[in-house]
Amino acid sequence: MTKIYLDPGHGGTDPGAVANGLQEKVLTLKIALKTRDILNRDYEGHTIRMSRTSDTTRSLAQRTNDANSWGADYFVSIHINAGGGTGYEDYIYNGSVSNNTVTYRDKLHAEVMKQVDFNNRGKKRANFHVLRQSSMPAVLTENGFIDTTADANKLKSDAYLDRIALGHANGIAQALGLKRKSGSGGSGKQGYVEVITPSLWTYNTANWDDKAVIVNEGEVFTVARDKFKVGNGYMYQLKSGLYITASTQYVRYYTR
C-alpha cells in the first residue's frame, strides 16, 4: 500500500500569508482535503495521512517527524505564495535528492499546470525544512500569490480550488503509479458526450462563468477527463481543452 503524506501549510496560531481577505492556512487546508478526497475517490492502492485536517498548529519538525515515522512514500506540502508575484511554482530540496524526487515533481508540476491557468513560474529548488528533513521524496507547491489581486480572485473560487486539487491528485497518482478505480475513467474505453439540447455553452475553464462557445444538438465531443464536481454541478473536460456540463438533461455520455 503506497503511503501519501499531505501537508497543508501553516494552521492554528500560524495563519501564513494574509491578504485580500484570505488566509493561507485556510486555503492550504481546503486544497489538501480536496486532494485527499479526489485520490480516495478515483484511485486505489494507497493510504493517506495528513499533518492536519483542521485548523491546528503543527511545527515544521512535527510534520516531517510524523511523515518519517509513518514511513511515507511521498511528502507533498501545499502552500500559497506571497510577495507580489503571480503564478504557480513548486520546489524540491536544493541539496542531493533521489531520482524519484525529481521525477515525481516533474509529473506533479505537469498535472497542476494542465488544470490551472496560473502563470507557470517553473520548477525550483530550495532549502526548506520540509524538503530537507523528510526522508522520502518531497515537494512543496506554491499555488498563486495571495497578495496579487488576480491570483487572489481565483483562490476565492471554490471551483478553482477544485482544479488545483485535481492537479495535485492526478500528479501524485501519476508519480506513484496509482491505479484508477473502475468507473472513474480507467476502463480503457474512450468516453464521448453528445449534445441533446438545441444549444449549449462550453467553457474555457472549469468555471461556470467562463463561457467559451455555443455547441449544437447532435454534436459529439471526445472526453479527456471524466466528470468532476464544479460548484453545485459537474463538468467533463473535452479533448479540445474546453469544458462542458455533465448534466444528463443536456448531454448523453457513452463509451466505445
Per-range role (PLM):
Residues 185-235, 243-256:
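Beta-loop motif signature
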Residues 10, 52, 94-96, 127, ...:
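Short, well-ordered turn and helix-capping elements at secondary-structure junctions
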Residues 2-4, 22, 26-184:
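Active-site-proximal helix/loop segments of hydrolytic enzymes
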Residues 14-16, 100, 201-204:
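Short, solvent-exposed loop/turn elements at domain surfaces
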Residues 12, 19, 113, 156, ...:
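Hydrophobic alpha-helical context, especially transmembrane and signal-peptide helices
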Residues 12, 114, 146-147, 201, ...:
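Active-site/binding-pocket entry motifs
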Residues 2-21:
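Short glycine-rich His-centered loop
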